[in-house]
Amino acid sequence: MTRVLQTERKESLSGSTRSAVVFLHGYGANAADLLGLADPLGEHLPDTLFIAPNAPEICNGIPMGFQWFPIPWIDESSEEESMRGMQAAVEDLNAFLDAL
């Protein structure tokens, strides 16, 4: 079962969306970290929707951030937990992209 990703978005400047840019943040960050790039990029891509999902899991050790999957050498999770988390994140992102 896929998890629904919470997103932040910036609509196209023209009001007519013909393309989309999806920003994926890194470990411990959140959607807002990258969505600010929409302003300078939007001037050059006026028909583009900019969207940034938050990763589905709260980041261990960084309570205001999110993670797509655990990273063993950072959070002491196991390789198995990391691989399961990565596969779940891939499924979540595929469902998210299919719904755009």
Regions found by a protein language model. Give the residues of each.
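Serine-hydrolase catalytic machinery in alpha/beta-hydrolase-like enzymes
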Residues: T2-L100
